[in-house]
């Protein structure tokens, strides 16, 4: 994918995250700052988890990856970059204190750089294999967004299975 097309797709993904965030806070007016901080994280985690599961099934099932598969993976990485960028942009205005930790700006900037390097070096396939690690992130984000969905045991076990083993 050439640079101009990648940039335009990145812009479209940014618009998508902007729309998802602001339509969510408009629709659910009682969301507190903490809940608002996890809206885009939930969307990004679901997207990456599904895409990573697809990649892992094909990879470990010894199926070949065609041009369309690699294009979708590239789109997934551009979507991830857009998430990190928009989380920093929107978060600066809407939920600043939730971006101050190591999981905020520093984490996002490092992952933007790593993602761009992976695209540039054409190593997006092995990079995408590891995004099954988004499962505990999704569980954590859902629990932070809605306390009824919080499950520390499920988070802990998925964290252990996907990130430690």
Predicted regions and their residues:
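Membrane-helix and juxtamembrane interface regions of eukaryotic multi-pass membrane proteins
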Residues: 1-133, 137-165
């Amino acid at each position: 994918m050439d640079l101009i097309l990648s940039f335009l797709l990145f812009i479209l993904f940014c618009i998508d995250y902007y729309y998802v965030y602001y339509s969510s806070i408009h629709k659910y007016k009682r969301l507190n700052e903490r809940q608002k901080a996890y809206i885009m994280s939930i969307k990004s985690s679901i997207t990456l988890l599904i895409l990573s599961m697809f990649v892992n099934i094909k990879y470990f099932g010894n199926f070949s990856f065609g041009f369309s598969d690699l294009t979708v993976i590239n789109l997934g990485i551009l979507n991830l970059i857009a998430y990190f960028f928009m989380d920093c942009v929107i978060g600066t205005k809407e939920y600043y204190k939730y971006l101050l930790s190591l999981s905020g700006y520093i984490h996002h900037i490092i992952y933007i750089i790593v993602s761009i390097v992976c695209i540039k070096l054409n190593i997006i396939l092995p990079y995408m294999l590891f995004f099954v690690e988004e499962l505990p992130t999704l569980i954590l984000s859902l629990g932070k967004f809605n306390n009824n969905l919080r499950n520390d045991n499920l988070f802990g076990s998925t964290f252990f299975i996907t990130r430690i083993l």
